[in-house]
Amino acid sequence: MSRTKSTTICIVRRDGKTVIAGDGQVTLGNSVMKASARKIRKLYEGKIVVGFAGSAADGLALMERLEEKLNKYRGNLLRAAVELAKDWRTDKFLRRLEAVMVAADKEIMLLISGNGDVIEPDEPVLAIGSGGDYARSAALALYRNTDLSARQIVEEAMKIAGEICIYTNSNITIEEL
């Protein structure tokens, strides 16, 4: 999977709460074009949270496709994600989309890519985007070694990613299930 130089999305589940966060920076070449973009959303009547890293237009198009699949499969996130990944890999139009997504409901958390990947992590922590490795590392350390809430873990992980990754800012949007 190629590294997406665009943003950071981090998602953590703990004590029945699922929290997703995304930074607001949009970078075009070497310039910051916007500092307050919204790259995370709630879908399917607010029961599923989704975030994307990569091209904004592509990420939004994929969110729309995922929402269609969720409606078709009555909110079954795993089934919708697998069907989206199959379409994404085989459809001529979708194959060109450059984004990676994370999605979660109250029970499952998934990374979805155009390579056909639908990955559920071993631990309830995922992060994607250019600052994803930093955010995931910080979130895993906090998850394993503290009693912080999911929200506190996500906030701190995003803060750390924003301090290290030049494509990630500290203008964080958070959604919670």
Swiss-Prot record:
Keywords: Allosteric enzyme, Cytoplasm, Hydrolase, Metal-binding, Protease, Sodium, Threonine protease. InterPro entries: ATP-dep_Prtase_HsIV_su, Ntn_hydrolases_N, Proteasome_sua/b, Proteasome_suB-type. GO terms for cellular component: HslUV protease complex; proteasome core complex. One of its GO terms (molecular function) is metal ion binding. Protease subunit of a proteasome-like degradation complex believed to be a general protein degrading machinery. Its EC number is 3.4.25.2. Allosterically activated by HslU binding. This is ATP-dependent protease subunit HslV. The active site is at T7. It is found in: Cytoplasm. Na(+) binds at G162, C165, T168. It is an enzyme of class 3 (hydrolase). Disulfide bonds: none annotated. It comes from the Bacteria. It catalyses: ATP-dependent cleavage of peptide bonds with broad specificity. It comes from Persephonella marina (strain DSM 14350 / EX-H1).
